[in-house]
Amino acid sequence: MEAIKGSEVNVPDAVFAWLLDGRGGVKPLEDDDVIDSQHPCWLHLNYTHPDSARWLASTPLLPNNVRDALAGESSRPRVSRMGEGTLITLRCINGSTDERPDQLVAMRLYMDERLIVSTRQRKVLALDDVVSDLQEGAGPTDCGGWLVDVCDALTDHASEFIEQLHDKIIDLEDNLLDQQIPPRGFLALLRKQLIVMRRYMAPQRDVYARLASERLPWMSDDHRRRMQDIADRLGRGLDEIDACIARTGIMADEIALVMQESLTRRTYTMSLMAMVFLPSTFLTGLFGVNLGGIPGGGWRFGFSLFCILLVVLIAGVTLWLHRSKWL
């Protein structure tokens, strides 16, 4: 493939444009730099910026069917070979487990052995790890190594997020053993996050597996082996997600059971109180009718005797309930 001049990928509002030096480091791209397989270029763009959008729409370095994909709407992870290059869409975890499950950020990239063009709208936090390694001179030396390092960083962030969700589920299970109900919506958010992760990480694992099996010219056997290891690691994370989803279903049933038992207990208590006080309520209502005068109304000890009778009646009903093992 012919070399590319640095001026051809000069985008004023690019997030950054770097030239890999072949020794694990980078340097800012200059107009007179020569871009080839030994010194590939990484151009990172925000496709909502006007200059970046114009460059994506007009540059002859990209196939026509790649332009819309790099600046289009978010889609599920996928990989497509297009001539000498490859179009890849990946998802990255941004944010924490306390956020709503919309923190999966899309990153699209087109690459061949000379040029890496990556686009995003929101910042991809996982790229910070790769950028840091490159700035310290310990990063990838070629396009294949760059792709492996990026996929490894994405998987690290996904695995860490899955582990955080798993820890939350363990804490929730421990609380349920102590009859502690989580706040309303907590379990639903947790389950939604797991489902969203499952939705995007499953095809992303397939992307990694395909990259490991494809004979891409800019990926060595070592790159393919490392990519397969990344796919296997993400597959284990997906197994963990499936187990967590099943556990949240069990916890939802357990929470419903605990709440039903609590409601039954309260209803039972109110029923017992009604049974205890129903006879006394009947007598007080009967005497309160006051037709033809209240019996014993003219006797000075009548009210006291009536109160004693009520106490005896309540005690008798309580004793009966206790012997019947209702109390």
UniProtKB/Swiss-Prot annotation:
Transmembrane segments: 274-294, 301-321
Subcellular location as annotated: Cell inner membrane
GO cellular component, one term: plasma membrane
Entry keyword Cell inner membrane: yes
Segments on the Periplasmic side according to the record's topology features: 295-300
The keyword Transmembrane helix appears for this protein: yes
Cytoplasmic side: 1-273, 322-327
Organism: Salmonella arizonae (strain ATCC BAA-731 / CDC346-86 / RSK2980)
Family: Belongs to the CorA metal ion transporter (MIT) (TC 1.A.35) family.
Domain of life from the UniProt record: Bacteria
Reactions this protein catalyses: Zn(2+)(out) + H(+)(out) = Zn(2+)(in) + H(+)(in)
Name of the molecule in the record: Zinc transport protein ZntB
GO MF entries: cobalt ion binding; cobalt ion transmembrane transporter activity; magnesium ion binding; magnesium ion transmembrane transporter activity; zinc ion transmembrane transporter activity
Principal location listed in the UniProt entry: membrane
Function noted in UniProt: Zinc transporter. Acts as a Zn(2+):proton symporter, which likely mediates zinc ion uptake.
Cited Gene3D superfamilies: CorA soluble domain-like (3.30.460.20), Magnesium transport protein CorA, transmembrane region (1.20.58.340)
InterPro entries on file: CorA_cytoplasmic_dom, CorA_TM1_TM2, MgTranspt_CorA/ZnTranspt_ZntB, Zn_transp_ZntB
Encoding gene, per UniProt annotation: zntB
Annotated keywords: Cell inner membrane, Cell membrane, Ion transport, Membrane, Transmembrane, Transmembrane helix, Transport, Zinc
